[in-house]
Structures are given as structure tokens and as C-alpha cells.
């Protein structure tokens, strides 16, 4: 997995300090970094850092991402966490607890095509 540009431009200590400050100030919010997959043909997102309500579902967050990149309804978008498609109905808080980075942020990547993951169906 390619290193996040947010990770490259911000040292670990600074990211850890920022995420813990955010979690203290907003305990009901999840600090999320969203970046476009390298080879994706969808537009770039206007901002990378989001404070997401803990009770938001992945599907609702994907809707937010779609709106931020102004993607038409006819185009597909896939959001990945550690190269895996998270379940649409999963709460962002559950995804955060399972996949948060050592710096305290949850990193998500979006793409116009299913470039990474496999969808696991129970």
C-alpha cells in the first residue's frame, strides 16, 4: 500500500498529537483522512481531513465523499480501508476501532474502480 501523502507531509508525532487533541475535544467524532487512489480517474477531493460522527455508516460517509468530489450518480465510487472494502452498513466508529492507524487517524482511499479489494459477503 502506498504511503499516504498526509503521512509523508506530516511527521508521526505531529499526527499523533493532532488526533489525540481532536479525540479529546470531540469524543463523539472520528478523525478520518480521505485520499484518492493513485491511478483513479475520479476527481481529487477538496479536503482530506474529516471529523465524522461516530454513528455515521460507511455508506453515509461514501455519500459525503461523492458530494465533495462532485461525482455524478452514474459513476461508481469505491472507498477502501487498508485495501479492503468495508461493509456499507458498518458504523464508522467500528471501522475506526478496527483499522485506525498508530497515529490515531483512520485512513480511507477512494477510487472510481474496484482497484484493491475483494468484497466479502457473509
Curated annotation (Swiss-Prot):
Its main location: membrane. It is a lipid-anchor. Residues 1-21 are annotated as: Disordered. One of its GO terms (cellular component) is microtubule. Residues 118-122 form a propeptide. Ubiquitin-like modifier involved in autophagosomes formation. May mediate the delivery of the autophagosomes to the vacuole via the microtubule cytoskeleton. Interacts with ATG4B. Interacts with NBR1. This is Autophagy-related protein 8a. It comes from Arabidopsis thaliana. The lineage of its organism: Eukaryota, Viridiplantae, Streptophyta, Embryophyta, Tracheophyta. The gene is ATG8A.
